[in-house]
A protein has these predicted regions:
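Residue-level detector of conserved, function-critical positions
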Residues: 1-202
Length: 202
């Protein structure tokens, strides 16, 4: 209507008294809407969940959406509440209960309570895997961190691959040789190899 957008329900009722410049699809009971160059989120009752309009809003995943304001990043929950008092230089979606955040060129993880997982910030960080581990890089070496913020291995590696979900091993490179570690960070073999492939099944 007059280049404005809204939603209509199965009874033919217009969802919101507010008309928008653009609207997105509903996801997890919420939809992104835009007005005057800024974004917000509307629920199935036609209510905006936040009093704050943002420069950008991403889709909800695991109960949180990434929001951008003045070049900084945060998260909102399904009630429109900010997850953290800290705004970050970068933020990624929640996966397996944690989201990667970036601050001052370093990476860490944030949980659904808004707590930073580790006192140590990292040069690089990968998303948590279903096994409950995330790959992190510090000073050109790699390790695994668990959901308690503890390093899985006493060793730091030249490279770490993803955990194999069936066998529970991750491919690693240490001092130029290849090996595997288990979920406790222990090497599978006492010797290193010139090359090692991932586990295969027949």
């Amino acid at each position: 209507m007059d280049d404005k957008w809204n939603f209509i329900n199965a009874e033919g009722q217009i969802l919101s008294t507010q008309w928008f410049d653009w609207v997105g699809n509903f996801n997890e009971g919420l939809a992104k809407v835009g007005l005057n160059g800024q974004d917000n989120v509307i629920n199935t009752d036609g209510q905006l969940i936040s009093n704050q309009w943002f420069d950008g809003v991403q889709i909800f995943h695991e109960g949180f959406a990434i929001v951008e304001l003045d070049g900084k990043w945060n998260f909102i929950d399904t009630e429109g509440q900010l997850l953290s008092k800290q705004w970050f230089d970068g933020a990624w979606i929640f996966y397996e209960g944690f989201a990667i955040v970036k601050l001052n060129g370093k990476f860490n993880f944030i949980n659904p309570s808004g707590q930073i997982l580790s006192q140590q910030w990292f040069n690089e960080a990968m998303a948590f895997q279903p096994k409950g581990f995330a790959i992190v890089k510090l000073n050109d070496k790699w390790n695994l961190i668990n959901t308690e913020g503890q390093f899985v291995s006493n060793l730091w590696f030249d490279w770490i691959g993803d955990f194999n979900e069936k066998e529970g091993f991750a491919q690693v490179k240490l001092n130029g040789k290849w090996n595997f570690i288990n979920a406790k960070g222990q090497l599978l073999s006492q010797r290193g190899f010139d090359w090692a492939w991932e586990f295969f099944y027949t």
